[in-house]
A protein has these predicted regions:
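Metallocofactor- and cofactor-centric catalytic cores in central/energy metabolism, strongly enriched
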Residues: 1-213
Length: 213
């Protein structure tokens, strides 16, 4: 492993670098110190993880938008779909289950780029936790907006305030956990069936004395 990388004080973000922080050179070419470099690198890791989880969720939402009774993908858990539709104020009474699914999918896809408001799934969190997020100003907005904000803010000549970098990292992390990942999980259950407890058989052959099983 790279010792400089483990310390987090190497920056490869812009074309003028890479820059490495040492006692003799405490700042990079753009003026970033070790705190800013570590913060930028961490923020970009958060953005990458959020993009990965959330783009998976986007594909699942597109799949549900194309689901049909005789198609390759069908609705396996209608009850969970109805529950989610009601949470999102989607009309369900007297409607075909696939019409409901398509509208719910459209609402979910808006979570990635909507211009106003915060993530819909935040209201599923404990009220006390929602209050903390609101007071800290880290309620995630549109998923793609949070990722783009980090990529923009960590570029050369932009944010050099470590507190701001950590703040946006927290907000983007919540966009992952309480938006992208929630969409991916709930929609997967609706399309493929909610996992249930099952029984299986195993013997001592699955255990190894030198491993934690």
């Amino acid at each position: 492993q790279c010792g400089f990388g483990l310390q987090g004080n190497c920056c490869r973000i812009c074309g003028m670098g890479p820059c490495r922080i040492t006692p003799k050179t405490p700042r990079g070419l753009c003026g970033a110190d070790e705190h800013v470099i570590v913060g930028r690198n961490f923020a970009r890791m958060v953005a990458g993880g959020t993009a990965a989880h959330s783009d998976h969720a986007r594909d699942i939402a597109h799949t549900m938008a194309l689901a049909s009774r005789n198609g390759n993908y069908t609705i396996k858990d209608e009850s969970k779909l109805i529950t989610l539709a009601k949470e999102w104020d989607v009309e369900t009474e007297g409607r075909d289950i696939y019409d409901i699914a398509h509208e719910v999918a459209d609402v979910a896809l808006m979570e990635f780029g909507k211009p106003y408001g915060v993530a819909r799934f935040l209201k599923n969190a404990p009220v006390k936790r929602q209050k903390v997020w609101k007071e800290l100003g880290i309620e995630p907005r549109a998923i793609d907006r949070e990722v783009a904000t980090i990529m923009h803010s960590t570029h050369i000549g932009c944010t050099a305030d470590i507190d701001s970098l950590i703040h946006m990292s927290l907000r983007t992390s919540l966009a992952d956990g309480w938006a992208g990942s929630m969409i991916g999980t709930r929609f997967s259950d609706i399309l493929f069936g909610t996992p249930t407890v099952g029984e299986t058989e195993a013997n001592l052959g699955v255990l190894e004395e030198n491993k934690v099983n």
